[in-house]
Swiss-Prot record:
Component of the 7-subunit TFIIH core complex composed of XPB/SSL2, XPD/RAD3, SSL1, TFB1, TFB2, TFB4 and TFB5, which is active in NER. The core complex associates with the 3-subunit CTD-kinase module TFIIK composed of CCL1, KIN28 and TFB3 to form the 10-subunit holoenzyme (holo-TFIIH) active in transcription. GO terms for cellular component: nucleotide-excision repair factor 3 complex; transcription factor TFIIH core complex; transcription factor TFIIH holo complex. It comes from the Eukaryota. This is General transcription and DNA repair factor IIH subunit TFB2.
Length: 514
């Protein structure tokens, strides 16, 4: 199994697991308050595994208790692991509780969740859970305008992370969030924010996972500001269930949620007119928060689609009901050539992209040479890789990025080569090698060069009166485990910072002049 391509393709499942883990760790009283919102119940249901969804739909409209043995009978023998995982997840979320009879192995749906989720499915008493739609005014906001706004906000964040020179930077709250989430850190020399290892991993995820990464960090920060986590989560789940292109009133929102709208504007999740803050519009980034259908390959996919429309002169009109191109839908589609990479055995790289964001990401580990209208060329060099490594990006991440964005022809060629090997030797255990092995191995070797150099804080001992004094002190440092390096010929040794005082005290006792 090749782990590297899975970094992106499994991003949708990755963010689901992370959100579920956050929800599972909430105290039960907080979970119960969350389940009072039908929109939140619907969103949580969407985040569950398929088997957990099946169990909930089987129990939602029946009042009798259910035996765990019955659930076990519904599952095939080879799916027992998924069964236990689904039961465990529902128990941690307190979606299922002990039955009223108190008999062992008898369970029932959480009564609060059951009532709210039933209302969400049947259109019952949902109150303000799914927002209050308000009438449009004379100057309506189109979906193309919302896509352009969301792309501009999200593009600003991603460009800032990769260090592209910009005329504008994200707001203070966004910068604080990037630091708090450890996606960026302050460079000791320049005193400016730079991308971290986690930040580059963030760029490898799909848009859903990226947004949830920031929102989960926002939740942890909100707790430090004494913001009610139930209000925060309810608003996040609510905007994920709203209809794109509709205007919604802020009436009915708590003060915490109204404050949140200001922050969500900076992330491109909602749009508000400065002249009328009494209503807001969810953007496409918001409506795909809990979506299982649409998965944009990367945030730059949404950005690039808007850039292409601008270049083609598309104004406020909607293209086939969406402002996102078909090549931006479905993770990893081979039809999406924008940003596709070709890597040669001579370390030359070609990227079919004119996206400033894509080019900026490449510049983190590639020495760019030439830029054409729809393509850039560059060279993978020792210096460019070492620069990336010094910035916290690992060799595996660089390889993963290039494999994930490899041109479909490279994938087909790798597949053909693997088939030929299997024809000659059916027992061959080689895996699909999309990138040239020489390039992959060399990038890993360049990382090993840096890994060989390890720095320690400590003290150097030298200029001894005689060989015996050197040998006794060096042996003592070795015996107590503080000796880091020694050179018998030069009569020098190096001890750790913590062991320096012990060595000095021993020298005073052993060699003090009488």
């Amino acid at each position: 199994m090749e782990p590297t391509p899975g970094i992106i393709h499994d991003g949708h499942n990755l963010f689901k697991n992370t959100v579920n883990e956050y929800l599972q760790e909430l105290p039960q009283p907080v979970q119960s308050r969350l389940y009072q919102s039908p929109a939140t119940c619907l969103a949580i249901y969407r985040l569950l595994s398929p088997m957990a969804k099946f169990f909930i739909m089987s129990m939602i409209f029946q009042d009798e208790e259910v035996s765990l043995r019955d659930l076990d009978r519904w599952v095939k023998p080879d799916a027992k692991f998924q069964l236990h995982d689904a039961i465990k997840s529902m128990k941690l979320l307190h979606l299922i509780t002990e039955g009223r009879s108190g008999q062992p192995l008898m369970v029932q749906l959480n009564s609060i969740f059951k009532e709210s989720f039933k209302n969400a499915l049947t259109g019952g008493e949902v109150k303000n859970s799914f927002g209050n739609v308000v009438e449009e005014e004379n100057d309506p906001v189109t979906m193309a305008m919302l896509d352009s706004y969301a792309a501009d906000k999200w593009e600003t964040i991603l460009h800032f992370m990769v260090g592209t020179p910009l005329t504008k930077s994200p707001g203070k709250n966004v910068l604080s969030l990037l630091r708090h989430s450890k996606l960026m850190e302050v460079d000791e020399s320049s005193k400016e924010l730079k991308i971290t290892n986690e930040g580059f991993q963030f760029l490898l995820q799909d848009a859903n996972a990226q947004i949830w990464t920031l929102l989960l960090q926002y939740l942890t920060m909100a707790e430090t500001f004494q913001m009610d986590p139930v209000d925060v989560l309810n608003l996040i789940f609510m905007i994920g269930a709203l209809e794109l292109g509709k205007a919604y009133s802020v009436v009915g929102l708590s003060e915490t949620q109204k404050t949140m709208l200001q922050d969500l504007r900076d992330y491109g999740l909602v749009f508000q007119k400065q002249s009328n803050l009494s209503k807001f519009y969810p953007t496409r980034l918001a409506t795909m928060l809990t979506s299982d259908v649409v998965s944009i390959r990367s945030a730059s996919g949404a950005v690039n689609s808007v850039l292409r429309q601008r270049a083609e002169g598309v104004d406020g009109k909607v293209l086939n009901g969406t402002a996102l191109g078909d090549d931006d839908l479905q993770a990893g589609g081979e039809g999406a050539l924008d940003g596709a990479l070709i890597v040669e055995t001579n370390f030359k790289l070609y990227s079919y992209s004119n996206s400033p964001l894509q080019i900026a990401i490449l510049s983190l580990f590639i020495h760019l040479k030439t830029r054409f209208q729809n393509m850039v060329t560059g060279q993978i060099t020792r210096e460019s890789i070492r620069r990336a490594l010094h910035n916290g990006i690992t060799a595996d991440q660089i390889i993963a990025y290039m494999e994930t964005h490899a041109h479909p022809q490279m994938r087909r060629l790798a597949g053909d080569n693997l088939e030929k090997k299997l024809e000659l030797d059916p027992n061959c255990r080689d895996t699909l090698q999309v990138l040239p092995p020489t390039v992959v191995d060399q990038i890993k070797l360049w990382q090993l060069e840096l890994d060989r150099i390890i720095s320690y804080d400590g003290y150097l001992f030298r200029d001894f009166d005689n060989l015996q004094e050197y040998q006794v002190l060096a042996q003592y440092a070795r015996d107590i485990g503080v000796l880091l390096w020694s050179d018998d010929k030069k009569k020098m040794f190096f001890v750790s910072k913590e062991g320096n005082a012990q060595v000095i005290d021993f020298h005073k006792r052993k060699f003090r002049k009488k």
